[in-house]
Amino acid sequence: MAADHFGSLGGRTILYTGAAGGLGLETTVQMLRSGARVIAVDNNAAKVAALQDAAAGMPGLTVAMLDLSDLVGLRVGLERISAEVGGFDIVINNAAIYPSKAFEDYSIEEMQLVQRINVDAGIVCVQVALPHMKVAGRGRIINLSSVTISGGWSDLTPYVQSKMALVGLTRSWAREFGRHGITVNAVAPGAFPTDAEKIHPDLPAYEKRIYEAQALQRRGAPADIANILMFLASDAASFITGQTIHVDGGWVMH
């Protein structure tokens, strides 16, 4: 799909966490092609290098190697960048960690770390971006949730907790920020073939389960997520807010 299918993002500045990851890279490249400036927050050096290679020759990419678990440092870094670029028009909260083990084996500290990175860091991003959005009278906030919120998953309690929290934040923010022309939506990806899958000990059995659950008999591709994020970030989605959109091949149906 062409990067400008839903209209140009030219002139928009996007704050995108986890922008160099398995699903982030494709979206970042599409948004750069559409004329956006992307502040890519990611601290994985190898993935950042791959993103920079993929974006070679395209203007607009700024990499911010910030630690999302350090909320104070994150806020300071984002406020500095916001002042330099004139504010963020679009926030995409995508970064997450994905531990897997039996619930009783998690320490409180481990569970709190998941919430800090998967939820609290996104809250900081929105708090930093919000003043500019309010003055502009428009804005887009997109939270990446997960198919796991719909149940049927074991050993992922803190991850599922964090992804359901993002749905609640999406609805609350959509109601509160709507008067300022700001839309807030969530996207719940299904099971995509990324590095996150490597936590599953039996990958063939895991993939078999995916095909049994999905209506569509193919694996999702990064472009499937990039396309919906491009749409929600664009003016074409200006009357959609407070929604959680599942992109999962028909795994969950409403």
Task: State the predicted function of each range.
Residues 126, 162, 170:
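Active-site helix of classical SDR
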Residues 146:
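Residue(s) in the substrate-gating loop at a strand-loop-helix junction
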